[in-house]
Amino acid sequence: MEAKPVAIWLFLCSLMVICMVGIGGFTRLSKAGLSITEWKPITGTLPPLSEQDWLKEKSKYEATPEYKAFNYGMSMEEFRTIYLIEYVHRLIARLTGLVFILPFIYFTLKKRIPKNAVIRLSTALLFGILQAFAGWYMVKSGLVSNPHVSHYKLALHLLLALVIFALLSYQFFDYQIKPKQIIKINSNITCYIWIILILVTVQIIFGAFVAGLNAGLIYNTFPLMDGQIVPEDLFYLQPAWLNIFENRVTVQFIHRALALLILVLTAILTIKNASIKPLYVMLFSVIIQVILGIVTLLLHIPMAIAIAHQMFSFILFGSGLYCLRYLRNQI
């Protein structure tokens, strides 16, 4: 079957994007993201190969505010560890790009991809290029006087990854779902799924805010926030709207509230349309994601569960896209 290699390639690319999200989370939680102070897309492919190279890289890091504030006196062995974590992060990002670009060129030249898919995948390529620049833009924000990556730029980096994943996975579903699997449905269902996907996107952005502001380190109780449904200090910043984006308490409160809203809406949609089996996959994904979020909070952000929570948000989004593709043009 001619479409099968293309479908396998799209699945692999989608999977690699999810893996990159996990690696990015591991890099952030390991506090290794600022260890490489330069961005060299081509020459940066190789790590330091000699002791002199390592000393040179360490001296560059020692000039950064992060080193002076948090890692002063760090040994060479400790530096190698965080450097290699960030190096692997960047290397796999390059590898992901190659795994996408080379087969894309081949399949396009061989006319194995329909024209509408070429446009969609070219858009994914464009966003991939933007993602590379956004990654460096994010790192650069932490190399200034305040050694802390901007949570806005962290959210942008994650959002671009989500767009790339959405384009790739939706195209993959195009190859996987056959007409015989599709049923007649009410037009309102797709509208409801779109609403849920928009809420999931906003939730992922607020997840990035929670991570960037270390908001997961406060109010480590559930369902109440230290005994309160609505915690104090929700609006202590002025102007009031700033709390939505920069107040750790408000950001965590919104993240919790959105999770419950998405769960309730997905449950209602599934119950009302019990004959549509893909909705159960989306509901199950929401339940797993909520559980991962609660456990991450209660256990004070254990690395493995926190990374799983971040990665699974993309799987949840993908389950919603699958539902959309399953129901498309069946009105």
UniProtKB/Swiss-Prot annotation:
Key words, A-Z: Cell membrane, Heme biosynthesis, Iron, Membrane, Metal-binding, Oxidoreductase, Transmembrane, Transmembrane helix
Residues bound to heme: H255, H309
EC numbers: 1.17.99.9
Pathway of action: Porphyrin-containing compound metabolism; heme A biosynthesis; heme A from heme O: step 1/1
Superkingdom classification of source: Bacteria
TM region(s), chain numbering: 6-26, 87-107, 124-144, 154-174, 193-213, 251-271, 279-299, 301-321
GO cellular component labels: plasma membrane
One biological process term in Gene Ontology: heme A biosynthetic process
Membrane topology note: Multi-pass membrane protein
Reaction equations catalysed: Fe(II)-heme o + 2 A + H2O = Fe(II)-heme a + 2 AH2
EC class (word): oxidoreductase
Subcellular location as annotated: Cell membrane
Family classification: Belongs to the COX15/CtaA family. Type 2 subfamily.
Role of this protein: Catalyzes the conversion of heme O to heme A by two successive hydroxylations of the methyl group at C8. The first hydroxylation forms heme I, the second hydroxylation results in an unstable dihydroxymethyl group, which spontaneously dehydrates, resulting in the formyl group of heme A.
Protein name: Heme A synthase
